[in-house]
């Protein structure tokens, strides 16, 4: 009898834990911010997990070439993509082209964005506010508009394209530019570099604008040449922003579709994004699985880039300049004529690109 009454008075430890957990859950969801966070977290998980599972299933599926239905599951799609008889033309060449275009796009983005950021933050350039606003236009504009602008300017009747016509440049000058300037690696990388140049401008411009000039001034006092100050002092301080820009532009350019399909497909210059789309949505159901394998490759590359960014961010060393007062960087003089000429050139370039 006593043991029965004791069991009634003392609840089961399991139910005590359940009740405690329920109270903690109610307390957690009692905060609106936590509820919103969990909701969007679950939504994000579903929007990424379901497509990922679907893609992985498709990579393992073999479809009937005529009926298009799944006949079996095998690793054959992976073998055909990486080591099959058509792997070189279907996968490796487009992948190498994409990597080359992405590297070149990083160069152009750093060139355009870096030079503009330096001119605006370190010189007496005219129309700084206007140029800063206009410089964002190439990124705001859709990629395909920039690609169409390039093609309409430089296309000509001499290129190897069935639908070739006389573009604006040929109509005005009578000069037919070579094929490589209209279609292929160079125009794709150039347009992508122009499109993503605002990334470099924002990241590098922020560092240049807030950079402590004491180190640069100390180097100048020691009679170190200005070009050496730039490469030995300024550039190292910009390294984190440069690396972030490279990772951001590289990953974006690698997965770009609109520009490669406009400036590459007319001459059968396929990158991995356009090749993947052609294989997935093409008329041959037998190679759709290989196209999905390519999408997995793009996802893996994206994850690797994210991990590299996290690693370099976590291992970045912080330096502090101990001084009485932070100095402002010296404004470089472009000259009475130079500042107007450079300003007009930048405005013209960015207006044409936007």
Predicted segments with their positions:
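Internal catalytic domains of large membrane-associated glycosyltransferases
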Residues: 139, 198, 216-219, 228-230
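Membrane-water interface segments at the C-terminal ends of transmembrane alpha-helices
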Residues: 30-66, 83-208, 237-258, 262-264, ...
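A short amphipathic helical element positioned immediately N-terminal to and/or at the very start
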Residues: 73-86, 230-231
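Glycine-rich helix-loop "coupling/hinge" segments at transmembrane-helix boundaries
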Residues: 67-70, 258-285
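Juxtamembrane inter-helical linkers in multi-pass membrane proteins
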Residues: 69-70, 74, 217, 225-229, ...
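Transmembrane alpha-helical segments of polytopic membrane transport and secretion proteins
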Residues: 1-39, 310-347
């Amino acid at each position: 009898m006593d043991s029965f009454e004791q069991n009634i008075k003392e609840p089961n430890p399991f139910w005590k834990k359940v009740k405690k957990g329920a109270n903690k859950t109610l307390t957690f969801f009692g905060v609106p911010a936590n509820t919103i966070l969990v909701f969007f977290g679950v939504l994000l998980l579903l929007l990424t997990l379901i497509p990922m599972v679907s893609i992985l299933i498709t990579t393992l599926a073999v479809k009937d070439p005529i009926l298009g239905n799944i006949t079996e599951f095998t690793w054959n799609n992976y073998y055909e993509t990486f080591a099959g008889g058509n792997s070189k033309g279907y996968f490796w060449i487009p992948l190498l082209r994409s990597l080359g275009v992405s590297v070149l796009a990083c160069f152009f983005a750093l060139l355009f964005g870096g030079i503009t950021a330096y001119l605006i933050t370190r010189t007496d350039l005219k129309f700084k506010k206007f140029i800063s606003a206009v410089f964002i236009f190439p990124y705001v504009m859709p990629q395909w508009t920039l690609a169409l602008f390039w093609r309409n300017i430089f296309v000509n009747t001499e290129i190897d394209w069935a639908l070739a016509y006389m573009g604006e440049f040929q109509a005005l000058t009578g000069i037919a530019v070579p094929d490589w300037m209209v279609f292929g690696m160079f125009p794709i990388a150039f347009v992508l570099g122009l499109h993503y140049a605002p990334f470099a401008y924002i990241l590098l411009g922020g560092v240049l604008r807030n950079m402590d000039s004491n180190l640069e001034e100390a180097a100048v006092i020691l009679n170190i040449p200005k070009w050496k100050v730039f490469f030995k002092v300024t550039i190292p301080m910009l390294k984190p922003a440069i690396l972030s820009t490279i990772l951001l532009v590289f990953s974006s350019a690698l997965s770009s579709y609109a520009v490669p399909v406009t400036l590459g497909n007319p001459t059968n210059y396929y990158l991995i994004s356009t090749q993947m789309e052609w294989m997935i949505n093409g008329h041959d159901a037998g190679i759709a699985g290989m196209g999905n394998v390519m999408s997995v490759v793009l996802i893996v590359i994206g994850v690797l880039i994210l991990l590299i960014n996290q690693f370099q961010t976590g291992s970045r060393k912080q330096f502090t300049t101990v001084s009485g007062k932070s100095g402002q960087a010296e404004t470089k003089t472009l000259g009475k004529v130079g500042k107007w000429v450079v300003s007009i050139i930048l405005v013209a370039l960015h207006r044409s690109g936007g």
